């Protein structure tokens, strides 16, 4: 990758990623699945290249099982506020999140 007088292309990619974080609409909600078990579902991150890493970090930080499937992150248990707080700490705009 070449550099110009405005900075490296890597810094441009970082800027674009930050702009993407600002325009994403994230919805965090509780759902009931098999056998009456609660799960936390996160939508709106499917366009992100690092959605697998985000899923792994959420599972590790919250201490629960989960998966990324069909454009949704699904975590075992009701962790809506914890997910919101972790995403805000990761740099996502709190105003772009809807917690139901």
Q: Where in this protein do the model-derived segments appear?
A:
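Long, charged, low-complexity intrinsically disordered regions
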Residues: 1-56, 60-61, 67-69, 81, ...
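A generic structural motif
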Residues: 72-76
